[in-house]
Amino acid sequence: AMINRPMSTGDALYLDRAALAELDIGAATVRIDERTSLRILELDDQRAQIELTAGTINLSVRNVYEGQYYEIDTPTLAFVVEQPGIYRVDISPSGDSTMISVVDGSGIVYGQDNASYSVSNGRSYRFNDTSLTDYQVFSLPERDEFDQWCLERAQRYDESESRRYVSEDVIGYSDLDEYGTWGSASSYGSIWYPSGVAVGWAPYRNGRWAWIDP
């Protein structure tokens, strides 16, 4: 996949060894570990539903607005976010169990025959079947390299100067720090100035347009 390519309903993504990726979804960010396979089942202004078939993701939800819905489906369960927070979802190498780690926040796990289980912050939950009857509850494990990368990426967002000028729900707002600076004009207000721009530059002359179905 190309950097900054919009992803939409029906798109699939596989990360090979040593690869990492980040998806911005409105008020949430999905960070993806190596050897992970996922598909976007539904994505619009109200609903984000992702099918995780292998590997590990970190879901960081900054806000859950009225009517919004974040769901992660795995081979054994469906996890739905209830509150803003940080959630990690791991699928076992065999694919027959799913671990939900709730760093912060809360959610509901759904299984077969309307089974459900509430999960809350500070715990990891491993579900070994689709009925949610075979499960274990643990303390959160020590951070690994993927957790550390997710933390560093989150800090980059939190410390972004552009948060002072742009809503954090604007996808890619933190990139403005890297590619320009902020100033102000008495007749307009805050203005972002791109850096490294050649003389005579004008918008829309470079690059290309593409239509991505929602």
Regions found by a protein language model. Give the residues of each.
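Low-complexity segments
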Residues: Y65-G67, D113-P214
